[in-house]
């Protein structure tokens, strides 16, 4: 699954640490998601979509 988390994070001038704290996860989790090494749980995907005010489908898409 590809995603636009990195681009969205940068558009808000957030560091990986900042987004991790907002979402209640580790910086390593954010790194893995941004590098397409980890597909987030549905709960985490929903938190990300709520934070960025976008649908899960807009942020995460099949490769």
Regions of interest found by a model, annotated:
Residues 25-38:
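Recognition helix of helix-turn-helix/homeodomain-like DNA-binding domains
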Residues 10, 38-39:
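Short amphipathic helical patch at the helix-1/turn junction of helix-turn-helix
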Residues 53-63:
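Short C-terminal boundary/hinge segments that cap the last helix of small helical domains
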Residues 17, 28, 57:
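Residues within helix-turn-helix
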Residues 45-49, 60:
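Hydrophobic micro-packing sites on short alpha-helices
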Residues 1-3, 63:
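Absolute protein N-terminus
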Residues 4-22:
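Short basic helix-loop element that most often maps to the first helix and adjoining turn
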């Amino acid at each position: 699954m590809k995603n636009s988390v990195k681009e969205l994070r940068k558009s808000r001038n957030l560091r990986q640490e900042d987004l991790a704290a907002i979402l209640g996860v580790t910086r390593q989790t954010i790194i893995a998601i941004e590098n397409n090494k980890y597909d987030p749980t549905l709960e985490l995907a929903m938190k990300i979509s709520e934070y960025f005010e976008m649908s899960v489908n807009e942020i995460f898409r099949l490769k």
